[in-house]
Amino acid sequence: MNTGKVDVLLGLQWGDEGKGKVVDVLTPKYDVIARFQGGPNAGHTLEFEGEKYVLRSIPSGIFQGGKVNIIGNGVVLAPDLFMGEAKDLEKSGHDLKSRLLISKKAHLIMPTHRVLDAAIEAAKGKN
């Protein structure tokens, strides 16, 4: 049986503490970069070869050749945001098809979820 080392980067704030940028710095040292939970709410801006990218769903290891990137079971994907992000990366020459794996159990945010969420927040009022 092969055993390997696994490092996990966790955020213990509200999710906006800069994990994405830290992961981007660390990705050259790892073979697999995986998101295991979270959604597309914050995003992180990265610069790669002089171009700026905003990643909200796709792991930043996508910029490193030969790395496997995984979107895991606990990730919440918004298909419209994900597809926009993927198209922007592919237009810039980044190969997602051979380096990005998405769990069949990843959750989806559908337009109805956003409408319902907005209605619930509106019903709460300002307090």
Please give the residue ranges for each predicted region:
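Non-transmembrane, aqueous-exposed alpha-helical and coiled segments at domain scale
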Residues: 1-127
